[in-house]
Structures are given as C-alpha cells and as structure tokens.
Design a protein with these regions (language model features):
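Solvent-exposed loop/turn segments at secondary-structure junctions
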Residues: 82-84, 120-121, 146-149
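A short acidic-to-branched-hydrophobic micro-motif
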Residues: 63-89
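N-terminal targeting sequences that direct proteins away from the cytosol to non-cytosolic compartments
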Residues: 2-64, 69-70, 144-170
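Glycine-centered tight beta-turn/hairpin loop motif at sheet-sheet or coil-to-beta transitions
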Residues: 39-43, 70-74, 120-124, 136
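Serine/threonine-rich, low-complexity intrinsically disordered segments
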Residues: 6-9, 81, 119, 132, ...
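Short, basic/low-complexity N-terminal boundary segments at the transition from targeting/disordered tails
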Residues: 33-42, 80-90
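Signature of long, low-cysteine stretches enriched in small and polar/charged residues
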Residues: 92-136
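Short hydrophobic beta-strand segments that form the core of ligand-binding sensory/regulatory domains
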Residues: 138-142
Length: 170
C-alpha cells in the first residue's frame, strides 16, 4: 500500500519538473543597447582667487578663461571629448610620456597632474595643470604664467589645483 503513494509522488515529480519558475538570473531579456541610463554629468569646480577676472567664455565649447590683473597668469577651465592622452597632447603640444603626469584614481574620475614649459610672443612660459577623466569627457584646468613669475605664484597654483574637483551637474 505504501508503494502506490511513493510511485504517484515519483511520477508527479518527473512530470512537473519542467514547470519550474525561472529566477531573475535565468530569465531572458531583450533590450536596446542604446537605451541605457544616461552617463552622469559633471562640472569642474575650482576655488579661484577673487582677484581673477573672467576674460573669455565660450559655453558652446565648454571653455572659460580667467586672468589675474595685469595678465600675471591665466587659468583656463575647459571640457573636451576624447582620451586623456589625446587631450593632453592637444593642450600641451607634448606626448603623455614626455609630460610624465602624476596619475591619481578617484571614484568619480581619473586625475592627471602635469607641468610643462612653453613660449609665446611675450617670452618663456611656466605651465601646470590637472585633467580629470570620467570615462567619456576630459575636464582640464591648465595655468600659464611668465617663467620669471612662476615662483611668485607657485603657492597659489598649488591651492587652485588642490581644490579642483568634479561635482554633479544636477
């Protein structure tokens, strides 16, 4: 008599095994790869000295230029699409290997700090800057001054670069 219920249960188990509920991990999904969530939007923020005046802005290009009185130095805040190597090359005219930037990994973005020398119509320039890369966009803040004024403003440049970060645009 005990054999009949056991056989009935065994048959029931064998016939109902195909009726299992799929877990979320096993479920098939169909999605449009282009319809994922939008990447986060960031803004580059920096604590600039009150003496700096905005001398130019091109919001279509994502570029703002600040100068200290009498043109002692210039700060440019700019966004650019592309890989950090290409943006650094465009910004400085040098390859990344020649710049040997200091790389810092942050949760929101990778940061590259760099320095270089250059020249313009008025003479030799001392330049330094930072680039933050969120995976799609480069946010740059280079500082340029006459080479003979570099020691005068070195502490101010260090403070500006130390307080440069990405913040949510929302």
């Amino acid at each position: 008599m005990k054999r009949i219920p056991c056989i009935a249960i065994a048959c029931l188990i064998l016939t109902l095994s195909g009726c299992a509920v799929k877990s979320a991990a096993d479920a098939e999904t169909v999605c449009d790869p282009g319809s994922g969530p939008e990447p986060p939007q960031f803004c580059l923020t920096a604590e600039l000295p009150a003496e700096l005046q905005r001398s130019a802005e091109d919001s279509a290009e994502g570029r703002s230029v600040y100068t200290r009185a009498a043109g002692a130095y210039e700060v440019v805040i700019e966004t650019a699409a592309g890989a950090p190597d290409a943006v650094l090359r465009q910004l400085t005219g040098r390859e990344t290997a020649a710049l040997d930037p200091v790389y810092l990994a942050w949760p929101q973005a990778d940061q590259y700090q760099f320095a270089w020398t250059g020249a313009d119509d008025e003479g030799a320039l001392a330049c330094c800057g930072t680039l933050l890369y969120d995976g799609t966009t480069c946010y740059t803040l280079p500082l340029r001054c006459a080479a003979e004024l570099e020691k005068t403003y070195l502490g101010e440049f260090a403070r500006i670069l130390a307080h440069t970060r990405l913040t949510d645009a929302a």
